[in-house]
Curated annotation (Swiss-Prot):
Signal peptide: none annotated. The gene is leuC. This is 3-isopropylmalate dehydratase large subunit. [4Fe-4S] cluster binds at C299, C359, C362. Binds 1 [4Fe-4S] cluster per subunit.
């Protein structure tokens, strides 16, 4: 019997010829990552046990992303803990205020490459599967262990396969495919499983949209999300890679506990209603819902490709007078590129508030928090009660085109209702 891409990556990092689902292994990691929310606990854990050295300063990434620039004294102190630790240990991949969100920065800068095994103290670490890495979120104490030893103990996950055949409709993106998937299987439909995506529609997506799909695997309970590399992946990685990489592919006779096949041409832009990412409805069934805020950004959809799509909708238009729109590029490089292309001009002229790179309102951090009773349509990845502010606020999830169109009309809208000439 053959093996999946996930099993092959884990086997190589565990020093084994092969591994099987359910097997417990200790695997070498290529990168350990934490942010300003999760790293302080990892650092305190290392200090508690008297661990003076990290296993490899070049294989640790620390990113100040969630509450930056610091919104209060507590968040400033959290950032200082991380900054001081990075300086003390000469951590190679330390990113300070304004550099961006970790899940955008690491692929963008070639720090994560295909075939890597990455653990991060953030649930959306699964993002890197979009370029063919096995990456998964862990707790801060597990992350401390990884930082000290360069290893992680884990159970080999079962794999599920999701095949999207056919061609995508206009305005349908990777965000819609993953929302559709979660809507079909539920928030626990892939519990501790590797979610592997393939098919004609998946292969038509650029790397940015593949990262979006992998990013939201955790919203179905997945241990990871992964798309095997192809020519598009290699083209993306070759421009960025800071180290050698290895391409893995699933065997044709690999075993999957479940296989789903869907016709992508039957899918329209999707919207996840409160209060679960699985509460998915077509945008055509959502246009009666008024909104107070639109948010374009996050590690899910804050890359340059996302901003281009949003700008193509907003060009020459104005945000609805009773709606606010917050745009946050997911990294400094994305911000600079958006400036160079004139996208920031479009956003500001439309009436958007454009912020330095940060997670912002996605997690209810700052720069766009919702009041009681307010509704936001967002390009981010979660819509639990209180996720973006007050427990009695509401968050709706959608792709950048839908969010931008909604900002113009003050209600959830199909992009065709307000579309300008597409910039991409």
């Amino acid at each position: 019997m053959g093996h999946t891409i996930t099993e092959k990556i884990i086997a190589d990092h565990a020093g084994k010829k092969e591994v099987f689902p359910g097997e417990l292994v200790t695997a070498k990691i290529d990168l350990a990552m934490a942010n300003d929310v999760t790293a302080p606990l990892s650092i305190k854990t290392l200090e508690k046990y008297g661990i003076e050295k990290v296993f490899d300063k070049d294989k640790i990434a620390l990113v100040l992303s969630h509450f930056v620039p610091a919104k209060d004294i507590k968040s400033a102190e959290q950032a200082k803990i991380v900054r001081d630790f990075a300086k003390k240990h000469n951590i190679k991949w330390f990113f300070g205020e304004g550099e961006g969100i970790e899940h955008t920065l690491l692929p963008e800068n070639g720090i994560v490459v295909p075939g890597d095994l990455v653990v991060g103290a953030d649930s959306h670490t699964c993002t890197y599967g979009g370029i063919g890495a096995f990456s998964t979120g862990v707790g801060s104490t597990d992350l401390a262990y990884a930082m000290a030893t360069g290893e992680i103990w884990l159970k080999v996950p079962e794999s599920m396969k999701f095949i999207f055949y056919g061609k995508l409709n206009k305005w349908v993106s990777g965000k819609d495919l993953i929302l559709y998937t979660i809507g079909q299987i539920g928030v626990d439909g892939a519990l501790y499983r590797a979610m592997e995506f393939d098919g004609e529609a998946i292969r038509s997506l650029d790397v940015s949209q593949r990262l979006t799909i992998a990013n939201m695997a955790i919203e179905a309970g997945g241990k990871s999300g992964i798309i095997s590399p192809d020519e598009k992946t290699i083209e993306y990685v070759e421009k960025r890679a800071k180290k050698p990489y290895k391409i893995y592919q699933s065997d044709k006779d690999a075993h999957y506990v479940e296989v789903y096949e869907w016709d992508a041409s039957s899918i329209e832009p999707m919207v996840a209603w409160p209060y679960l990412p699985s509460n998915v409805h077509p945008v055509s069934e959502s246009t009666h819902i008024t909104i107070d805020q639109a948010f374009i950004g996050s590690c899910t959809n804050g890359r340059i490709e996302d901003l281009r799509i949003a700008a193509s909708i907003l060009k020459g238009k104005k945000v609805h007078p009773y709606t606010r729109c917050v745009v946050i590029p997911a990294s400094k490089n994305v911000y600079l590129q958006a400036l160079h292309e004139g996208l920031v001009d479009i956003f500001i002229e439309a009436g958007c508030a454009v912020s330095t790179s940060t997670c912002g309102p996605c997690l209810g951090g700052h720069m766009g928090i919702l009041a009681k009773g307010e509704r936001c349509i967002s390009t981010s990845n979660r819509n639990f009660p209180g996720r973006m502010g007050h427990p009695q606020s509401e968050a709706y999830l959608a792709n950048p085109a839908v969010v931008a169109a909604s900002a113009v009309l003050g209600r959830i809208a199909h992009p065709e209702e307000v579309a300008s000439e597409v910039l991409v």
